[in-house]
Amino acid sequence: MGAREVDLKNFFKGAATALVTPFDGREVNYAVLEKLIARQIKAGIGALAVLGTTGEAATVTNKERREIFAFCVRIRNKYDETRRTKLIFGCGANDTREAVKNTEIAAKLGADGVLCITPYCNKCTQRGLYEYYREICRATALPVIAYNVPSRTGVNILPETMEAIAELKNIAGIKDAGGNMAQTLETLRRIRRQCDLYSGADELNLPVLLCGGAGVISVTANAAPSSVRALCEAVTTGDIARAIQINELLAPLNSALFCEVNPIPVKAAMNLLGFFCGKPRAPLTEIENEHFKMLSSALTEFRAAMKNEAFFKD
C-alpha cells in the first residue's frame, strides 16, 4: 500500500459544519446560501462540508454540483480573504468513476479537500472500499476524508479497513457517523498516527473529542455554530468542565435535530431562525407537525439557556 507521501494529519481541527443546501422551489437559493456561509465564517467555524448528506448531495444534478462548488469558493473568498475556513466538498458516489470525476471537478474549482461517502446501495466488500478510496486518492492531491455512515449506505468501514485506507498518500481522516463508540475507539487506536477522526454524530461529539477525535463535522452547527465551536475549543484547551456544560446545553437540540431523518429537521430549524432554506427535495418530506413543535420548543429553550454565554452568537 506504500508509505504516505505527505502528512495531512493537521488538515483541520475543531468544528466543521455539514452545511445545508437551501432551495427555493426547484432551484438552489444562492442568496440564502451566501448568508449561511457568511454566518458560519463569522462564527469562526473551521471548515464547511458542502454537499454531504446534510446538503442533499444525492438530489443535486451534476450541473448544480459544479455551480454550488464554484459559488461556495467565491463566497468563502469574499468573506474570508485569508481562506482560514476550509471548503470540503462532498464527492462520494456509488460509482467509483463518478466519485473520481466529482473529486477532479472539486479540485479544479478550488476545494481545500473532499469528503467521500462510501459507495451506497452496491454494498461492496471491505476490499472494494479500500480500492474505492485508493482510486480517489490517485486522482487528486487534495486531502481526502473518508465518510462512514452505515445506517444510510448499507456498508461499514471496519477499523482494520480504515487502518489500510489511512496509509493512502492523501487521506486526511475519516468522518465517523456510525454511532458505535466501541468501533470509533478501535478505529482511533488504529489510525491516530496516520490521520484524524472527526465525529459525524452530534450526540457523540464530546466523547469522541475526549477520546482523541480531531474535531466534528456537525449538523447542529448549522443552527448553533458558535456553540459547537466553543465545545471543541473547551476540549482543546483542557477545560473539560466547560465542555461538559456546553454539551449538556446542546444535547436537547442535538436530539431534536434528529427527530426525523436528516436534513428534514435541520432545514426546518434554519427556517425558524430566519434563513429560508425551503423544504428538502423529494423523496424527503417536510417535517411532521408534532416534530416541528418539538423542534421549535427545543430551539427556543436552547437559545434562552445560552443567551448569557459570552461566546453565544447563534
Name each model-derived stretch.
Residues 4, 14-22, 43-45, 54, ...:
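C-terminal alpha-helical cap/extension of soluble enzyme domains
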Residues 34-37, 159, 292-299:
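Short, amphipathic alpha-helical "lid/cap" segments that border enzyme active or binding sites
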Residues 138-139, 152-258:
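Catalytic alpha/beta core domains of metabolic enzymes, predominantly
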